[in-house]
Each structure stands twice: as structure tokens, then as C-alpha cells.
Amino acid sequence: SLVGSEMCIRDRRRDHTSAYIDLLRSYLMEVLGGSASLPPRRGRPAKPFYNFPVLSSAAAKAAPAHPVPGTQLDFAGGTNFRELGGYEADEGKHIKWGQIWRGIPTCKLTGEADRAKLDALGLRLILDLRSSGEVQKEPDYVPDGARLVQICGLCAEDGHEISFAPDDIAALMKGYEESADGSTFVQAMYERMLFGNKAFKELFRALEAGETPILFHCSAGKDRTGVAAMLILLALGASDETICADYERTNLCRKAEIDAVLAEHAEEITANPACRMRYYRKAGVDPAAAPFVLRTIRAKYGSAENYLEAEYGLTPARLMRLRRMYLE
């Protein structure tokens, strides 16, 4: 019938229009380099246009194979320099590669090959989480095109920078009972970092502003850097298991340093096994510290989302935007 013919024509036009929209979207995705900012198209799925599949991003097809997430870069000058790219996060998406780096002071990377490798990262911002005293002893190397910001990632309640001098440690431990294995010191240090941290506020400001690739680091890339990385992963929707695994990966990256410290204090450890973890933490991290951080956040704020909004201004809308920026 005439009505049936008109409906059939409208269906074909709708199918072709739908296919054209998908072609346009895939073109935009290709031009934007696989940007996650394009929302899913509403409506029913499009049929292939002229029996050809909808185009996918050529950039994604041409992308080189990536290593296992958390694999450190091979620098002669130091260990534990790695990125957050590749980790699974919100809605099963993954963190974009080459954007968020966690590492060590760039002054340690003095060799020609190390400098070339560092320069090739195309860093726009280096956030140094060390104290001013640490920075004066070993100032960072800043590649062309990058800018350096130094904000201590561990400060006392009065704003005084903690430099791990005896007086600073005593002030940090005020109100805590010292334990044989040193676990209370780690808890005091990590809990202090979680609240009112100006360095971490700058870190999230830079991420929201798209000031990437970014490198954040402390002296060994394990404690101040480790907590900062945990918070980024938390904000991007990674699971607790992923967050803890990245934190603990420091022990794999710094195995040689850990073994050396334990060997140096072998006699003392044999006489008093309880002190083993104290020495272990000098070069590595305590696996129990990451779950402690997550528990502390949720105990005070009820949820990670409440914490991120209260401490860093990441409202639900801003958090969603951050995830669109760094997940794919």
C-alpha cells in the first residue's frame, strides 16, 4: 500500500541518516585522537552503510603495543619511574597512556640516554613533592617545554614542611604510640598527607586544567608519590585492588634497594625479627599502608566521592569531566 511504501522509505532514510551520523562521529573521534568527550549517540544502533562497518579510529589502530600497566621505565639513574596509563578504572575504561607519570627526582637521571628518554616524554609539568631542604640538596632537571612546581607533600598541621629530621619526626608522631615495626609512623605520615594537602590540591588542579603529561615525584617515588597516585586512581574510579597493587609495585621496582637494606641490618633483624618491616620500609613500602589509606578516607567522609569533593573540590560533575579527560 501507499502508506506501507512511505513507511519503508522513511525507515531506509532513517537507516542512512543513522549511518551518516556514525561515520561523522568516527571521523571526529579520529581527528580528536580518540577523545572520550563525545557522548554515546542516542537512538537505535545504525545498520552498516553500504555493508561497510562503521569506521574506527586510525590512531587507535596504529598505536603501539603497551607494556603491563605499572611497568617502570628503564633508567640507569634510578628506579620506580612509571605511569598510571593502562590501569582499568571507571566503567571498565582504562587510563590513557603517557599522560600521568609517577617517579623520582629528575636530577638523578644524569646520563645522556636517561635525559633523552625523559625529554621524549614531552612533560608539561613536574610537581616536586619534596621539602625545600631536600630540593636544595638535589634540584630537579627540567626538560624543555616543562615547568617546575615545588610544594611539599607532607606538612605538619601548622604548615611546617616535614623533612624527616628527628625533630620533624617527633612532631609528626605526637599523639601516636611508637611501635617496634614502625607502622605507627607510617600511619601518622600517611594520615597527615590525606587532609588539607596543598600539594595534592595543585596536582588535581593541574589534571583538571589538562596540564599533561605530568610527572609528580618525591625522593624515592614511594610514600608521598605513592599516596598521590592512590588518590588519582581513586578519582578515576579504579578498584581498591588496582589502587593497592600499584602502590605495592614499588617493592618490585625497588627490590634491589630493599635487599641491600635488609642485608645491611641482617644481624639486627635476626636478633629482633619485629624490626624487619621497619628496615624494609626504608627502601620499600608496607603493603598494609594502602588499605589503611582507603579505610581512613572512608571512615572520615563516608565515601571516596565525599572525600574528593571536600578536599579537592571534585564535585560529581567535575569528577565526571576528569574521567572523560583521562579514560578511554
Positions of predicted regions on the chain:
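N-terminal, intrinsically disordered charge-dense segments
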Residues: R13-R14
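Short, low-complexity segments with poor structural confidence in diverse proteins
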Residues: Y20, Y27-M29
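Gram-positive cell-envelope targeting signals
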Residues: M29, G33-Y50, S56-A59
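Cys-dependent protein tyrosine phosphatase-like superfamily
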Residues: F49-L215, A228-E328
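Ser/Thr-glycine-rich phosphate-binding loops at phosphate-binding pockets of nucleotides
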Residues: A220, R224-T225
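Short, small-residue-biased leader/transition segments that mark boundaries at the very start
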Residues: L2-I9
